[in-house]
Amino acid sequence: RQPLGAVGISYQLLDLGDQDLRDGQGNVLGSVSFRDHLAILSFGLQVLPGLDTGLNFKVFQSRITCRGQCTDAGVTGTTYALDAGIQSEPFSELPLRLGVLIAHVGPNLQLINVEQADPLPTRLRAAVSYETLRHFTDIPGVELWITAELEDRWRELGSPILYLGGELVAGEDDLFFLRAGYGQQQSGQNAGASVGLGIRYQRFDMGVAKRLSGSSLTGESEPVHISFGVVF
């Protein structure tokens, strides 16, 4: 029997840090914390041989909370978003993948009032990926995928950002991933490389990633990103 598809659930926490709240004389009155929460429900389905489609429904919440002698308890904003994409392997004997995605489609994020609501960063992405190791060696269970991706703003098409990446996959049932990528300069980010690795063992997935360049807004380095998943 053909499976109906796959369903996934994930949660992401972005800790943006804390900041002291001070009076005019510099005395610490309290502490303000900044946290972003993202819950994702995903569904994927093979609609035709060599053609897959996927959909994400996301709930995003941004929280600014204050502890101590605060004028208010903070603010919270919640919004919803959708991602939708398709991936095709048009040639059965050629390890080539093509994909198109529209991401972060949803209502504005409102923290204070409607006039100050922020639109979501809706993006259009198109990518191509090719397995290159087959031209150099024939090691069972080892693949090297090279990917090129263009990303553009949905509301201001015409200035796409280019991303290049590679993923070395080793194993069959239990897998090891080694990843590297490079992205062009964009708003808030310097051009630079990223590295990462991942492990899939039985029902468990774990990944670690690090962007080597810092933010062009703060000058600080990017944090290490850690992900963990369980397949039921």
List the predicted regions and their residue ranges.
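Outer-membrane beta-barrel porins/channels
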Residues: 1-232
